[in-house]
Structure formats: structure tokens, C-alpha cells
Amino acid sequence: MAKLDVYNTSHKKVGEIELSDAVFNDEVREYLIHEAVKIQLANRRAGTVAVKNRAAVSGSGKKPFKQKGTGQARQGCKRAPQYPGGGVAFGPQPKTYNLSMNKKARRAALRSALSLLFKNDKLTVLDAINLDTVSTKNFVGVLKGFSLDKALVVTDAENRNLELSARNIKNVKVLKTEGLNIFDLMKYQRVIFTENSVRKVEGALQS
């Protein structure tokens, strides 16, 4: 069974934690990780880009001049694409980029990502993160003790003092276990769990 050292916020080792092999030492399926990241980024797209076609441009639909007898090419209306200020031909219109991934594949992707992080020694486990007050300075000190400047912190429950202390630190993000996602796991230099959040993630991904 996989094991990791457990530290306190003073950077001292206080014990060990056994990790579920089914979650943290599973087969790494990189294609699933790639697919999950691609879907997550696609679903962030607003898809609201739009231009006016000839039907949407304001103005008359009257012919600018008669069909015959002028010596010029025939024209339908001044809203046509060839006129300045006319509608755009075949321009972009709003669309949805949403993609989906079934629950089984999504869980497998999370297990693969966590296993990859474990194999690459990018996981840190703390016994708890209890901040008595909101203090960015104190939390920066905790991170510096582990030589970190880019980290994802995963908690098992809402931790208001921690969230407020971390929100103004560049390249640091605090997530509850319910919000754990592939993109953030892959983005940060290191992922910091508490013991309770490890157990909660294991419970969610083993079931």
C-alpha cells in the first residue's frame, strides 16, 4: 500500500498515512487525463461570438438602382456583403462547445491524475490547516516552509480563514474535495491535502 509522510504547518513530520492503491496508485491513463482537461476547457468557452449577416443589418431592402439600363452589375440591396456596412457572409454565430464525460470515465481520470502526482512525488499531506485568523503572511510562511510558490490546497470542508488568507496569493488555489478537478490537479506545482480530505477523496473515488 502506498504511504506518504504527514506534516504539520510547522513543517515537522508527525506521522504517516496509508493511501488507497485504488485511488493513488492506479494505472495512469494519460489519454483519459487529456480528454478530461480538453472537456473542462471546452465547457468554459462562452460561445457568444457573433456578427451581423445581411438580415440583421439595419437599413432598407430596396434595390439601390434598377435592374437594367445602368451599365452596372445588378444589385439586390445595400445590406449585401459587398457593400461597406453590409452584413458579413458566413460569419461566426453563437454556438455551444459543451462536451460531456460519463461518471465512470471522469472518476477514472481523477484516479489517474492522483496516481500520476503520487508517482511524481507531487503530493503533500498535512495533519490539518487551522488558521486562527485571516493572515496571508502566515499562510505564505507555511508554503515557504515546503519551498512552494505554486500549490493547490484541497480541504475536506469550508475553511473560511484559509480561503481568505490564500485568495490574494498568486498561483495558490484552495478547493474543497467536491470541487476537485483534473485541470487544477495538473496545473499546480504541488497538491496539498489534509488527512481528512485524503479520506474523503478516497471514499468518493472508490465507490
Swiss-Prot record:
NCBIfam families: rplD_bact. It holds the Pfam family Ribosomal_L4. Part of the 50S ribosomal subunit. GO terms for molecular function: rRNA binding; structural constituent of ribosome. One of its GO terms (cellular component) is ribonucleoprotein complex. Belongs to the universal ribosomal protein uL4 family. Keywords: Ribonucleoprotein, Ribosomal protein, RNA-binding, rRNA-binding. It comes from Geotalea daltonii (strain DSM 22248 / JCM 15807 / FRC-32). This is Large ribosomal subunit protein uL4. It comes from the Bacteria. GO terms for biological process: translation. Transmembrane segments: none annotated. Residues 59-78 are annotated as: Disordered. One of the primary rRNA binding proteins, this protein initially binds near the 5'-end of the 23S rRNA. It is important during the early stages of 50S assembly. It makes multiple contacts with different domains of the 23S rRNA in the assembled 50S subunit and ribosome.
